[in-house]
Amino acid sequence: MNITTPTQPIRTPGDILANIPGILGFFPAESAILISIQPSPHGYSIGPVARLNLGDVPGALQEVMDAFHCGNPEIIFCFVLSQRREAELWDILYSLYRFEDRSGLGIDACWLAEELSTDTAYDLTFGHATESGEGPLQDWMEGTIPAISTSHSMRACVDNGLLPELTRSDLVQRFTAQNPYFAEEEISAMERCAEELAQQMRAGEGYGTTDPVEVVEHLIADVYYVLSEVDSLEEALENEELLCVAAMWMSTTWTRDLVIKDLLAAPQEAGALLLAVARTFHLSLIHI
């Protein structure tokens, strides 16, 4: 089977493993990595990816699969990363093998590796047959992880001046609230204002109109203008108006979903602004 990232063919599980740090933004450990494989114009491609703490298996599997169904998953792969002895992982591996979601989709194959590092061995724990049904391809049964530094996702990180963090905690630390320009009371007031505006627009009111269609049109049209005002992360951290507008976008899933396409179209500006939001507001903004 050939699978692709946007520009790079993937021919073995090792190739997938080598791309995981660049996809997640950190090197996971003691984790189960679920990867959806879906059809694309060029064959199969990697779709959404999810990481679970081993202690969350199998409890969180259904929630992950529900999210995967937002795409068009045909195959689900799992990679278990752990330093534990295989006997200690038996219950986890068995629950992965037995799992089937509400639509009947299960995990087609699972591999075990001690860690994500170049030349680390991986082994198939269950799945995946060849087209003839005679058994797995040798490279899909066992192998070693190729150079992580040359994987497509890692090269994309380097090209953008980034490197994956060593741990998930290090990654989360980047988003910890640390805006030095506003006092706690000011931030709380900004958060309340953002939530109220989002709720008002969700109800079809705003921009001087009570026509829900016009509200949506104005909201979407504002994205381009707001992003054009973003010059840097530091300036976004200082700008109360930009922070409030972006916080309003993130306050409900409804507003977030309306603007997400335009945010993705301007990754540098949107990235700086949303990082400023993450470093300013302490609580989760998404309520609906």
Residue ranges and their predicted role:
Residues 288:
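Calmodulin-binding IQ motif helices
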Residues 37-42, 114-116:
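Short acidic-glycine loop/turn motifs at beta-strand connectors
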Residues 2-22, 27-29, 47-285:
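Charged, compositionally biased boundary regions
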